[in-house]
A protein has these predicted regions:
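Acidic/glycine-rich C-terminal interaction modules and beta/coil loop segments
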Residues: 1-83
């Protein structure tokens, strides 16, 4: 939930369609699990042993995390908009 990806037209309440896979390319939008806890949908960019989680809304900060802290759940394919 939230509007961190509004710049990619992914709105609060949309249902994301995710293809389960752990591989990705930089700048793909992926579903990520952070610290075996929270799930988020962000663009990702890999830098050696760091990963940047990049929102498409400039009002949200980029999170830079050690790669071991995240699990790539899958790649974003599209969405279903309710309403």
């Amino acid at each position: 939930s939230g509007d961190s990806m509004i710049g990619d037209y992914i709105c609060d309440g949309d249902v994301a369609i995710i293809k389960k896979q752990s591989n990705y390319k930089s700048h793909d939008i992926v579903a990520v699990r952070v610290d075996n806890d929270e799930f988020t949908l962000k663009r990702v960019e890999k830098h050696d042993d760091w990963v940047s989680l990049i929102p498409s809304n400039p009002n949200f900060p980029i999170k830079r995390l050690k790669a071991h802290r995240i699990e790539i759940v899958g790649r974003y394919l599209g969405l279903v908009r309710k309403g």
